[in-house]
Amino acid sequence: YRMITTPIQNSMGPSCADPRSGEIIQGDVLFYSNIIKLLHNWRFVQTATVDPKVRKAVFDDETMGSSLRYVAAHEIGHTLGLMHNFGASYSYPVDSLRSATFTQKYGTTPSIMDYTRYNYVAQPEDKGVALTPPLLGVYDKFAIKWGYKPIFDAASPEDEKATLNKWIKEKENDPMYKYGPQPFINEV
């Protein structure tokens, strides 16, 4: 981890890959110096109606720590080669995000690579509901398996495709494994 002194409120997880193989040979997690202010504002706006401990100017260490862990995990995901997954935003039904049983088991999103930072759907009467994302979502675990699990019976990278495609086929109709790429807008 490195801290960058800048007025910008952000973080990033750049990596460098070998162009011949795609192997990631270097990664970094960068926290911009105003990340605490950004996380405070996001969490306050998205959860203060249901979480009294965020209704103050400075969060306690546990509250801010959970937000920093989310950002660190998201940026580490980038260093591992994971892209943003905006398909996760619409994977969970609204009533599930208001359920303590569901959110305690699955968290607030199936992918930390989405920008679903906090459970802003929760209402004051939703007691025990999770307000923060899991350390890793079910999609993230699957994506890491897909990218990194050795396929020992494959003689070449070409031979791995059947197994990789089979894994995708097994999850294609499960909404927790939706993938939605980040849209990019190019100048005209």
Spans of model-derived segments:
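Alpha-helix termini
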Residues: 35, 39, 87-90, 94
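Generic structural "secondary-structure junction" signal
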Residues: 3, 19, 31, 84, ...
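Catalytic Zn2+-binding segment of zinc metalloproteases
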Residues: 76-92
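Metzincin-family zinc-dependent endopeptidase catalytic domain
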Residues: 1-79, 107-108, 118-121
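Conserved catalytic/binding loops enriched for acidic/polar residues
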Residues: 89-188
